Amino acid sequence: MQHVLRTRGNSAQDKNKKHVPNVPPIIYDDMQVPYEKGAFLGEGGFAHCFEFRKLDCNDRLAVKVVPKVILLKSTAREKLTREVEIHRQLSHRNIVQFHHFFEDSQNVYFTLELCSKNSLMELNKQRGPLTEHEARFYTIQVAEGVKHLHNLQIIHRDLKLGNLFLNEHLQVKIGDFGLATFCEKNEKKMTRGGTPNYIAPEVLNETGHAFEVDIWAIGCILYVLLFGSPPFESRRVQETYVRIKNNDYVVPENASPTANRLIRSLLDPVPDRRPTAEAVLLDQFFKTTIEPTYPPVHQQLHKEQDVKYFAPINPVLPHVEEPISPIYQEVANEETSEIRRFVKTEQASSFGDELSQLQAQISHILQNVVASKNKSSTRFGLNHSPEATPIFWVSQWVHFPNHGIGYRLCENSSGMLFNDNTQMKVNSAGNQLTFVDENNTEQFYTMNDQVPMNLQTKINIFSNVQSYMNTHLEADTHLEAEDQCVNKVPPLRNFARLPTIQNWFETKSAVIFHLSNGTVQINFLDHVKMVLCPLLKSVTFIEENKRVSTFTFANILTNSCPKKYLSRIEYAQAKIKLLRPTNNQEHVVYVDSPCRPTTSNTAHGAPLASSRYLA
């Protein structure tokens, strides 16, 4: 958890964190509507957050819980009152929706929109630096939300990746208004608070601050999205403050001129020289058009092939692309001009290091937890760490011996690893195709692009594999029930880089996948999935009934975890070493496979996957 600076109340806050709320399994609002408690989502400040299901309509919500014992102090009551007063009046597509506020004898509750894809902080941990196109996609949404706040004379004052949540469509939602305040025109606030890596110099210098502190934070956010770490970050907080006061940071040379100029304007040490949120949205960075470096291919696919391949994966719920706002449409239009380009991706040389790191992490867990395996665990509710749940995992797969393995990820994107070590993947909307050749060079295409003739055969194979999965395999839908969402929004384009299967094999007990983002997934024959993420240092278990439990490795070391999971972690330790690449290793390896691939003379071979491996 990031360090939060406050000159007053630090000790009180530390004490507040000891007040873990006693939350009953069923709570009732002031209209006696029942809510059923679900997973623990996280904590911050003096509140804990849980998922709840509203039983009268089955809606799933996030519920922030504050123990009343904390509110005995007037400062805490005033802070909570201000937070509720500000948040409940907000209604915007890029702000977490506030629904309701009520209390019982022990706690105060407020119900919020549930953001199922964690936050940009988790995305940053998994992905590191994003492409400029992706950074534009997220930053423009942050600026839209900030513009709405500033129009209402509200300063957020704690904008950071951890407070920028993502819904199932990767739509950014600004949350946590614990430090927010109203601010009149020409008024200056003197409170010294915020998060060190995002705090503006005028706050540190105590010269008075206003709306410009949020603009500064947008600059820090854009910098982190583009380059992976905050601009003023250092090992010591005080050194970070010195760098902020001196405006001591460097924009990497690989930044585009428009990105460089925008960052420098957002991080201007003089507040009055920073752009307004409205001006940020009009910046050239969000309108930049990069000419395609790959010339169009004149040989065009037949229209029938285009429609068949790029049709929505789920025919029951056809995807409808609608602009959210004019500024979103401009970014979407810019996408097509940049999309046809070759990108040399990082080679797989780091895969062995990632697997070695994961093996070491698991070994450390098993060596230190083995003594506690037999003790009963009764406190797993708060030990769950849903914020460490990976964004992607394999939900379906099928193997055709003559061609390769096709698969679908949990958010409905799909891909295929061909026998010649090339890859093909398509996003969940079915309108963006990526081909990765044997040299690990990526080629991007959209629905309107002319695809080279030499890819037509693989596109046809990939299309047939998708059709097979649609027809024959059980759908592994999102763990959240999207049809029960309160506020439907048009799906946004998914710009997160989709991982691919880099290596896989079968045993008599399971199927093991290694993804390009470092994740290792094991699908057991009893329909339990285990997803190990070395970057988030966590393990996620997905039961046959779709129940999800995520534990950080640190959490397991401290509190152990259910005995039924430890044996699976031991199994993973034994099998991960078989995934480590050797000099001549191909992508696909088979170990003790009960259904070893055989030569087939049919058009696509007999699939070796079956529903027993699927959730």
From Swiss-Prot:
- Which GO MF terms are attached to this record? ATP binding; protein serine kinase activity; protein serine/threonine kinase activity
Main role? May be required for cell division and may have a role during G1 or S phase.
| Entries under PROSITE patterns matching the protein | POLO_BOX, PROTEIN_KINASE_ATP, PROTEIN_KINASE_DOM, PROTEIN_KINASE_ST
Upper classification of the organism: Eukaryota, Metazoa, Ecdysozoa, Nematoda, Chromadorea
GO BP terms: mitotic spindle organization
- All copies of domain Protein kinase, residue ranges: 35-286
Name under which the protein is recorded: Serine/threonine-protein kinase plk-3
Q: Where would you find this protein in the cell?
A: Nucleus
Q: Which domain of life is it from?
A: Eukaryota
- Which residues bind ATP per the record? L41, G42, E43, G44, G45, F46, A47, H48, C49, K64
CDD domains xref list: POLO_box_1 (cd13118), POLO_box_2 (cd13117)
